[in-house]
């Protein structure tokens, strides 16, 4: 779970206790009648993770009544939804590693990984049914955006489309949308004022974009498995990222070999090593960090409309923790 050192002691104690409750609920709810399904679905749960999304739900609930029993369920719903998409993403990307452990598709094959993702969506839906029709509607709208974002990424930009703008749109739909749902659930299920909920949703979508852009930087810059994935994973898969798209925009004569490698998946490990070294020394990496901080700062500014209290300070700390991952 992400550490927020600047939280007030009171907010930190409360958040830690409720996050522990989410963790127990998440692990228990993944269980089913078929032991193998329980094993595969708990694979990534047990691997850990930052738990940004349920944490965001819990923090948002502090603007209303955070003791309502639906809040913990909502936090588990968003994390189960996120986990399900990871199983599916790893199949599409043929990723061997997730959260520092062997991916489900690598261990059990694509069919089991896909079905495990479906299973987690089903388990999420069971909880969602207890949250009311509005919660179901917003989950469906968010899921539509997630899928459309994935389709957009798979299809790629058309003709003269701005490749960077297309990518930011993909990130908004795939990552920003679920962050927004987290805040919406925490806000409106706790009975927060509608204007507060709206502000929290907009803040969280912007935060979600910054979160993914930070991951793009980490994929290039980390020398270890900082992101839980093998460094250079996106390069191996030929997936465009903020850093590689900026290299295209800021290309220099000496980048000819790098640009050739970035035009598709990089299969040779020697070429991956070369590309990572070239990207780490390219001015595009610094620009990617600047853009990431710009989105995080945009999210921070939205918090000016919220009451200045321990929870708002916690959301500010979340922004700082996110940016520090890529700085």
Predicted regions and their residues:
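All-alpha prenyltransferase/terpene-synthase fold signal
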Residues: 1-327
């Amino acid at each position: 779970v992400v550490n927020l050192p600047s939280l007030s002691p009171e907010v930190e104690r409360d958040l830690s206790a409720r996050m522990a409750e989410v963790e127990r609920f998440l692990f228990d709810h993944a269980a089913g009648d078929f032991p193998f399904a329980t094993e595969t679905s708990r694979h990534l749960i047990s691997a850990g993770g930052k738990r940004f999304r349920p944490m965001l739900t819990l923090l948002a609930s502090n603007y209303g009544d955070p003791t309502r029993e639906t809040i913990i369920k909502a936090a588990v719903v968003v994390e189960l939804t996120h986990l399900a998409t990871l199983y599916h993403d790893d199949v599409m990307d043929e990723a061997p590693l997730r959260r520092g452990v062997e991916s489900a598709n690598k261990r059990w094959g694509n069919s089991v990984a896909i079905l495990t993702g479906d299973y987690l969506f089903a388990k999420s839906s069971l909880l969602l049914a207890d949250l009311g029709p509005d919660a179901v509607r917003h989950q469906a709208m968010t899921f539509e955006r997630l899928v459309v974002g994935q389709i957009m990424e798979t299809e790629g930009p058309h003709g003269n489309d701005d490749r960077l703008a297309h990518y930011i749109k993909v990130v908004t739909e795939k990552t920003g949308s679920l962050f927004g749902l987290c805040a919406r659930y925490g806000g409106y299920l706790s009975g927060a004022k509608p204007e507060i909920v709206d502000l929290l949703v907009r803040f969280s979508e912007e935060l979600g974009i910054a979160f993914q852009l930070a991951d793009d930087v980490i994929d290039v810059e980390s020398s270890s498995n900082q992101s839980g994935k093998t460094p250079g994973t996106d390069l191996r898969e030929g997936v465009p990222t903020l850093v590689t798209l900026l290299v295209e925009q800021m290309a220099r004569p000496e980048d000819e070999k790098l640009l050739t490698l970035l035009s598709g998946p990089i299969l040779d490990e020697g070429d991956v090593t070369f590309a990572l070294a070239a990207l780490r020394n390219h001015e595009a990496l610094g620009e990617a960090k600047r853009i990431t901080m710009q989105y995080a700062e945009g999210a921070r500014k939205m918090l000016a409309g919220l009451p200045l209290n321990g929870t708002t300070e916690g959301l500010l700390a979340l922004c700082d923790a996110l940016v520090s991952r890529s700085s």
